[in-house]
Amino acid sequence: QSLDFGNYLHASLHRFGSVLGKENKQWRDATDEDIENLSSKIASSIAPRVRYGALHSDAASRYTENALNKTFKNTLSSLREWSKSSSFDTKALEHKFFLHLRAENGETFTLNGKIDRVDMLGENVAVYDYKTGHTTASLVEIVSGLKLQLLTYLLGLMEEADGNPLLPAALMYIYLSGDVKIVSSVPRNGIPDLPAKDGASGFITSSGATVYDLDSRAGSNDSILPVRMKNDGDPYNTGNVLSKEDFDHLLRIVKKRIIMLYEEMISGRIDIRPVRFKGSSPCKYCPYHSICRFDPSRREENYDYIHAVSDKDMKRELPGIAFDMTKPRKEDDNG
């Protein structure tokens, strides 16, 4: 199977984490020697699969491979430093989950998937998804059904817990530097031009104590967490900082949204009405325009517009949205 650079980093990272797990080690336990030796071993086994062996084709390609491997090592070092500052332990990598749901008509269906990484401290859970692009998710995108991934993962973990309490601590995309470029020739100095420091985006608990458990450096430039801390030890109430009640509302909304999407699919609804959000549409990347022939200039065809709302404003709307979406449907007046 051919891999692109992003998948290369993703696969390498998972393999490194799996090796640590088999040795009952956490990221913080990895030594410099572990990172050097294991990363080289992993890279040599995965690199031939990148773009059908393109990294071994000539000197410039081997230079690109060297840059990619250095990026991988830098990512490992960054994750290790974060782990040293965290009280959470990684409990699972590529964790499979099965979410069992029931539609309004009584039909049941199962949604399954795989979570890149699950960290825990007691009943506190953090869900992480590795991304090579700078993926983000706003609350309005989640509520409207555009970005359901992280909350769906949390729903799956909640079901597995089978009634045992789980407190969401973080739902985050962790960025991997997958933007190493193929070069046509080796630069004169031979030194790889590496991407900037990795970061993260997502949603964090409003509990200051838990935030510092996630990363004792929270609020500093060294922390990976997308959060700012106040002098009293609590995070600033920005749009991505959520209370337990906020998470509960989102889980109810996302669960209902998934059920609604299922019901639309089984009912045969195939409206050609692509979403448009912040001036962008999936049509930009879709290879099937010649089949659907969507044309917004025609009166009978139009986009499904999603209006941008700030996370801070959206948080205030969550209780009402959760209530409206999950209240029992009224019976038809004609019986």
Please identify what each model-predicted range represents.
Residues 1-335:
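Structural signature of nuclease core domains in nucleic-acid processing machines
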